[in-house]
């Protein structure tokens, strides 16, 4: 029989309290758009602040139109983004063109702002192979559908950038559910061991489809999981674009200076369903919770901040919305005009030099498609 110790070896309360204090939520703008952390204000010009707002407004319009197009049967798979604009757009706003983006399936907006033509984003939703072909000058992979798998890929891409002497980072995104996957831990551990220039963004929107974050992990925060991998972790108000930008900009600077990766947890909320494939949020979250997070809308918050500085107006936002709708209209027209994909198209892009057995199949399908 094991002997009992007179005193606990580990003071669990002290340990957990220390972790909680270490990962307090970083915020610059409160829900009213007021600056509550002047010392942390990022060095952005007025034009840059307006551009950040323009991109967020465009992304909200894109989400609304994409939902409408999906309901019309003109788009296929779609994961709504409303509510997560600060977490998505402000992180990307801190990047440079040479940085490498590895998105999840909800992160198409970041790809668009990184250079993916909008019409190709629509083709991706339709399952057309052209939607997965990044232009040569766009450093990115197409959205990862396997939850969390992009974390391992990001560690590898980041290490490659380091070995090539590039002053660039690899950044990836997942939700809170992705942080429960084994690939998540492998990715941050590998990146930490090799001090790879990576940024891991976990958009904690509170639900892994329908599973609340409290039932996914006993950890007080997702950010604290960085400690086990020996990397920096930070929890950010994911509805505050300035806080999200500042945290990402600092993480990027640290990475390119050889100080290793960062795990950023953004506290955010998706206003819509998990995807447009039949998910009903009313089955697993209350109206009270939805109302609480609607009061934290990143666009409302940032709009108030900019209006207070005299940098934004209703007229200016209306113009952005009008331009966005027209750009989306033209992009969907271009997507509609894309030739229907054929089996031979898919076979052509599989190998640089087609194997003999596929050459035979290629000829068979070529004849079928010519009829």
UniProtKB/Swiss-Prot annotation:
Its EC number is 1.2.4.1. Keywords: Oxidoreductase, Pyruvate, Thiamine pyrophosphate. Activity of the E1 module is inhibited by the pyruvate dehydrogenase inhibitor PdhI. GO terms for biological process: pyruvate decarboxylation to acetyl-CoA. One of its GO terms (molecular function) is pyruvate dehydrogenase (acetyl-transferring) activity. CDD domains: TPP_E1_PDC_ADC_BCADC (cd02000). Its cofactor is thiamine diphosphate. It catalyses: N(6)-[(R)-lipoyl]-L-lysyl-[protein] + pyruvate + H(+) = N(6)-[(R)-S(8)-acetyldihydrolipoyl]-L-lysyl-[protein] + CO2. Pfam families: E1_dh. The pyruvate dehydrogenase complex catalyzes the overall conversion of pyruvate to acetyl-CoA and CO(2). It contains multiple copies of three enzymatic components: pyruvate dehydrogenase (E1), dihydrolipoamide acetyltransferase (E2) and lipoamide dehydrogenase (E3). PANTHER family: 2-OXOISOVALERATE DEHYDROGENASE SUBUNIT ALPHA, MITOCHONDRIAL (PTHR43380:SF1). Heterodimer of an alpha and a beta chain. This is Pyruvate dehydrogenase E1 component subunit alpha. It comes from Bacillus subtilis (strain 168).
